[in-house]
A protein has these predicted regions:
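Phosphate-binding and adjacent anionic-ligand microenvironments
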Residues: 270-430, 435-460
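N-terminal small/polar loop signature for handling phosphorylated ligands or for N-terminal nucleophile
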Residues: 40, 44-109, 158, 188-248
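Glycine-rich phosphate-binding loop
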Residues: 97-103, 107, 227-249, 254, ...
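Active-site nucleophile and cofactor-binding loops and adjacent substrate-binding regions
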Residues: 74-83, 254-257, 279-280, 301-302
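An N-terminal, well-structured beta->alpha segment
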Residues: 1-65, 69-70, 149-171
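Gly/Ser/Thr-enriched, mixed-charge loops and adjacent short helices
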Residues: 110-230
């Protein structure tokens, strides 16, 4: 049996610490396992890309060897943003591709996001890869696969510039956090006619300035300062592999992804009445009524880019988003999450207004908490912990209890959510309400439920 760390096989991707849990040997074996799954589906060619992390080239060589030793042909697109790899996979390889990325994890992490035949690998499909490795159940190749290298950045750029049309040039600031988006985003937005100030767009896998994770306000502070001191109208930020978007107004307000989705939904629905719009369980309760008001059909889904993508395919939804910043456009695009493309669509909408920040600031808003995290005791299963808590929980005054992903409890004046993270051993909590008093009342009800398990510590 091959020696491989089981805990790198996560819910949405494979992710580990390079040289410790994610070794060269592991990358080679995972390459062979993906190739085995591909062969079962009759897939013969896979696109392969990497982000700007220092460990990327080494891991890429190993996974590529795993593919070619298994008879799979490789389209190597080099250093790209994750959405550019998806673009290459869909346009050149029938929807099959592997992206080597650590996303927003610390510099010593890396991992793989995978799609085969147009389907993102997640959940059981990722566990099946582990089973293939552990059983040594690899496909026997009758030939060595070939490798073709191609720069797809020009095609990706031209496709977007070809169909996104701004009403006027805008002045914007972008912050790539030294992630791979920095190599492409500035050129893209200039190509759309904008004046662009670039922050931390030099690709550097050490992330020397701040962490490339726009979902955390501390990572947007440089952008906020630049917007306040300069003459730009709006700020865009990206995570390490540029599949997520952060948005900041001229006056330094962070427009969280559930509010961004209001604007995107309104725009898409103006051309496609009755279209479905998907959002994750963490999103504001003001979103579903907004979608209905603009003629759409709101669909709540569990958190995770792979779940959202599969629900989009099933339902034919035209746009989707989740709180972490993944935005998915099926209308005029390919349905994968793409932070750079979402930024372009946002500029297209906002270019029709003289004061874009005012448009964003006027979007409906409640009082909400940032995400609160509770560490789980070692070895415990977060989903089981939530199930046990939910079994005996009482929520006074609740109007609805939603259990698609953890426990989301709706009240007339707010909601509370607790769910198990799929990527780290924590419980995630979020609260939103019309008033501070209502938030505290809802939090106190959740606190009582959490504290019914003595191993859990209330985070506030």
């Amino acid at each position: 049996m091959a020696n491989i760390a089981r805990d790198i096989f996560k819910a949405y991707d494979i992710r580990g610490i390079v040289g410790k849990t994610l070794t060269d040997e592991a990358a080679y074996l995972i390459g062979k396992a993906i190739a085995t799954k591909a062969s079962e589906k009759g897939i013969t060619r896979i696109a392969l890309g990497r982000d700007g992390r220092l460990s990327g080239p080494g891991l890429m060589a190993q996974i590529q060897r795993g593919f070619t030793d298994s008879g799979i042909d490789v389209l190597n697109v080099g250093m790209v943003a994750t959405p550019m790899l998806y673009f290459a996979a869909i346009n050149e390889c029938g929807g099959s591709g592997v992206m080597i990325t650590g996303s927003h994890n610390p510099p010593d992490y890396n991992g793989f996001k995978m799609m085969l035949g147009g389907d993102t690998l997640a959940g059981e499909a990722i566990q099946e890869l582990l089973a293939i490795v552990e059983k040594d159940g690899f496909v026997a190749a009758d030939k060595q696969g070939s490798v073709t290298e191609k720069d797809i950045s020009g095609e990706y750029h031209n496709n977007i510039v070809g169909h996104i049309k701004l009403k006027r040039p805008m002045k914007i600031v972008i912050d790539a956090g030294n992630g791979v988006g920095g190599a492409f985003a500035g050129k893209l937005y200039k190509g759309l006619g904008n004046e662009v100030t670039e922050l931390f767009c030099e690709v550097d896998g050490n992330f020397p300035n701040h962490h490339p994770d726009p979902s955390k306000p501390k990572n947007l502070q440089d952008l906020i300062v630049e917007l306040k001191n300069g003459n730009a109208e709006i700020g865009l930020a990206f995570d390490g592999d540029a599949d997520r978007l952060g948005v900041v107004t001229k006056d330094g307000n962070i427009i969280y992804p559930d509010r961004q989705l209001m604007l995107f939904a309104q725009d898409v629905l103006s051309r496609n009445p009755k279209a479905k719009v998907i959002f994750d369980v963490k999103s504001t309760r003001l979103l579903a009524p907004w979608i209905k008001e603009h003629g759409g059909d709101p669909v709540m889904e569990k958190t995770g880019h792979s779940f959202i993508k599969s629900t989009m395919k099933k339902t034919g939804a035209l746009v989707a988003g989740e709180m972490s910043g993944h935005v998915f456009f099926k209308e005029r695009w390919f349905g994968f999450d793409d932070g750079m493309y979402a930024g372009a669509r946002l500029l297209e909408i906002l270019s029709a207004f003289d004061n874009p920040s005012e448009v964003l600031n006027k979007l409906p808003q409640s009082i909400s908490t940032p995400e609160l995290n509770i560490d789980l005791p070692e070895g415990s299963n977060g989903h089981k912990v939530i199930e046990e808590l939910a079994a005996n929980a009482k929520f006074e005054g609740a109007t609805e209890i939603i259990t698609i992903d953890g426990l989301r409890v709706e009240f007339p004046d707010g909601f509370g959510l607790m769910r198990a993270s799929n990527t780290t051993p924590i419980l995630v909590l979020r609260f939103e309400a019309d008033t501070q008093e209502a938030i505290e009342r809802i939090q106190n009800q959740f606190k009582a439920v959490i504290e019914s398990n003595p191993a859990l510590k209330w985070p506030l």
